């Protein structure tokens, strides 16, 4: 049976395609918008059966042109949290997603989709409950609104619907994302260009570089998606993060030490890196005051209750792997 991945040339979509390939799955229809043509590179080492532009996909899928479809991994969306065109955002992230969902329900195909931790906005609790959901931008709102649709549909759905609220994802195949790429990606490139990594200084009671996020490797994101693909009886909306908040200092320090290791240099402690000017703290920008999350951490209770029991990579493990991968690309 056919598998479909939307956003297939994007960051998470391409990693899911690759993970499916590694399991012997190649009957995959890749759906994307290659107006930004350089994204094609994410699929060069992947095996797919066909490629479709997103503008023609939904109509053809709803018409049954692809025969029996087992599952749709819906990763396609505008993921720029700074986008201010609300009409564009809602059309791409909400209306389009509803159309894909409707086609999946009509055909009995598994629907696994990308939600976002941006739904939580400024909340200090990160649990899949309506009362803690308060998005701060139209991107978060587009994801929030679609999750509300899912909550209404789930009780009567006859096929799987599984949504994943991605936290701060990093890893291979994100180069095309530019400013929206991960902190690890930007730290890597900054250190190679300038010989140092710059982090925000003290803010809101957090020491320099100690603002925290739940940083999750795209390897783990793909594994969770495939776990639910293998268990079509499991539906719901799930946080997808490590359950561990780690500071930006951990990302920067790991980037520095991994690059040093590749140059046959010994590791340094964070204090030594700061002392030697390899990590530099800059004043927290006024423009971000009051709009910046200093802490995120996924509550994994629902994910673990669904049966996913594999460990997640720490920043030290995942970023080390990623930096080595990036170094092999340049």
Swiss-Prot record:
The active site is at 139 (proton acceptor), 177 (proton acceptor). Binds 1 NADP(+) per subunit. Pfam families: Epimerase. InterPro entries: Epimerase_deHydtase, Heptose_epim, NAD(P)-bd_dom_sf. HAMAP family: Heptose_epimerase. NADP(+) binds at residues 11-12, 32-33, 39, 54, 75-79, 92, 143, 169, 177. Catalyzes the interconversion between ADP-D-glycero-beta-D-manno-heptose and ADP-L-glycero-beta-D-manno-heptose via an epimerization at carbon 6 of the heptose. Substrate binds at residues 168, 179, 186, 200-203, 213, 292. The lineage of its organism: Bacteria, Pseudomonadati, Pseudomonadota, Betaproteobacteria, Burkholderiales. Keywords: Carbohydrate metabolism, Isomerase, NADP. This is ADP-L-glycero-D-manno-heptose-6-epimerase. Pathway: Nucleotide-sugar biosynthesis; ADP-L-glycero-beta-D-manno-heptose biosynthesis; ADP-L-glycero-beta-D-manno-heptose from D-glycero-beta-D-manno-heptose 7-phosphate: step 4/4. Disulfide bonds: none annotated.
